């Protein structure tokens, strides 16, 4: 809804009864201009506008978080009264993140308000309407209690975690609290391990979105007896998922596969997974040295961060092991520069390397509501493509529906480039 002079412009998902406009004009005592908008988008805006109120209403209907400890035993938190509106709001934010497939929950303190957002398919969406800034301390305190952090400490960052049992499955949450100019901010990573572990049992490379040619090459190199397979990309681009998919395809009782990760987020049957613990001195380099004494056939190093790890990984690949790893770089060619910068001899690295894959994740249009888009000529030209070559191609555009939460997108797929060392 917006005002244009004396007129009120209203968006309707569907206008089945035109007399509704007349009734509204009578009530508002102003002329109304009706516009038709996607029904999913209208529903999403209404839900967001009443977000805080709706969440509180839902939470008040006997909905409470069930906390469990590392041994799956129930935990009773001594915290704010159970009927506190802030407790119900935070609890509902957490449950809403699970229902909407969010990977992260952001609580940001602004100059005059507190904003809550969900990261869904890599994009931040408002979770509820902004709240008054006076609620900031209570919300952050609730999160600190949930994750067993120091409520009194507000000047330094704090990290914690908590675990819930929701709909019969256990879900982990990693909490990071950070002080800012206007107050404390929080980010909560949602790790639905049980659901994802089940998905990883069925995970294969051919469901990740790679082209057929890249898929054939990648499968060739992950079945080599030795060498190094490197996946690169920014944080959250699916590098670990790609490596897990590759390991799942080649895991057999005849091979011993050991991984070292920081942290071990998802468990794969038949594979020994070692978590990094830098506080106790277990770094990637030290863990990798220990792994080599356990007679592995294949090794996965979660990330190459330092020269020592890079050197050991390359030497392992040169001495008869198949090594999987990731490194942060912008593209496949930058990976070579990163390893050389970390002190690896160029000849050794190139000799050890089987292939490098750089990847990104892009959102996929929702299959339930996407519609054909005929106005694509300008976009094709801007992309450097000849529209004449795509005359018979049907393009689609996002719409928004209940299934995708009004965004028009549902899920993500990988886009990759490969450096094949045999070319």
Model-based region annotation:
Residues 11-18, 22, 32-36, 80-87, ...:
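Ordered, soluble secondary-structure elements with a strong preference for glycine-centered loop motifs
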Residues 9-55, 208-215:
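Short glycine/Trp-rich loop-beta-loop segment that forms part of the substrate-binding cleft
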Residues 83-96, 100-423:
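Short, flexible helix-loop junctions that flank or precede catalytic/ligand sites
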Residues 7-8, 71-72, 76-79, 203-204, ...:
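Short, basic, glycine/proline-bearing loop/turn elements
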Residues 16, 20-21, 59-68, 114-117:
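Short, compositionally biased low-complexity segments
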Residues 39-92, 100, 185, 191:
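Charged, low-hydrophobicity low-complexity segments
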Residues 1-8, 68-70, 75, 292-297, ...:
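Long, low-complexity, intrinsically disordered polar/charged segments
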Residues 1-30, 48, 71-73, 158-178:
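Polyanionic, low-complexity intrinsically disordered segments
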């Amino acid at each position: 809804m917006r005002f244009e002079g004396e007129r009120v412009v209203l968006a309707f998902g569907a206008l089945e009864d035109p007399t509704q406009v007349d009734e509204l004009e009578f009530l508002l005592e102003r002329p109304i201009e009706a516009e038709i908008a996607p029904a999913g988008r209208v529903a999403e805006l209404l839900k967001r506008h009443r977000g805080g109120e709706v969440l509180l209403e839902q939470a008040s209907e006997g909905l409470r978080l069930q906390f469990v400890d590392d041994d799956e035993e129930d935990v009773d938190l001594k915290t704010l009264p159970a009927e506190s509106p802030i407790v119900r709001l935070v609890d509902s934010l957490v449950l809403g993140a699970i229902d909407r497939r969010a990977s992260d929950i952001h609580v940001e303190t602004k100059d005059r308000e507190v904003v809550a957002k969900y990261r869904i398919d890599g994009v931040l969406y408002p979770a509820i309407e902004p709240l008054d800034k006076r609620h900031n301390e209570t919300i952050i305190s609730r999160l600190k209690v949930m994750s067993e952090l120091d409520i009194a400490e507000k000047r330094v960052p704090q990290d914690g975690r908590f675990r819930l049992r929701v709909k019969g499955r256990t879900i982990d949450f990693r909490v990071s609290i950070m002080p800012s100019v206007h107050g404390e901010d929080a980010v909560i990573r949602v790790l639905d391990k049980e659901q994802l572990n089940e998905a990883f049992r069925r995970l294969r490379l051919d469901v990740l979105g790679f082209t057929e040619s890249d898929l054939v090459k990648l499968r060739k190199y992950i079945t080599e007896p030795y060498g190094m397979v490197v996946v690169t990309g920014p944080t959250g681009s699916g590098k670990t998922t790609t490596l897990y998919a590759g390991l799942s395809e080649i895991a057999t009782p005849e091979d011993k596969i050991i991984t070292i990760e920081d942290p071990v987020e998802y468990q794969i049957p038949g594979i020994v997974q070692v978590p990094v613990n830098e506080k106790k001195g277990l770094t990637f380099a030290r863990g990798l040295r220990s792994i080599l004494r356990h007679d592995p056939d294949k090794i996965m190093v979660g990330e190459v961060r330092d020269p020592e790890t890079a050197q050991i990984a390359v030497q392992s690949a040169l001495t008869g092991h198949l090594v999987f790893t990731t490194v942060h770089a912008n593209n496949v060619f930058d990976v070579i520069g990163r390893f050389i910068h970390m002190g690896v001899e160029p000849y050794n690295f190139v000799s050890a390397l089987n292939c490098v894959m750089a990847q990104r994740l892009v959102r996929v249009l929702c299959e339930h509501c996407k519609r054909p888009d005929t106005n694509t000529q300008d976009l094709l030209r801007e992309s450097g493509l000849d529209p004449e070559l795509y005359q018979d191609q049907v393009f689609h555009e996002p719409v928004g529906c209940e299934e995708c939460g009004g965004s028009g997108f549902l899920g993500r797929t990988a886009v990759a480039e490969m450096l094949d060392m045999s070319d």
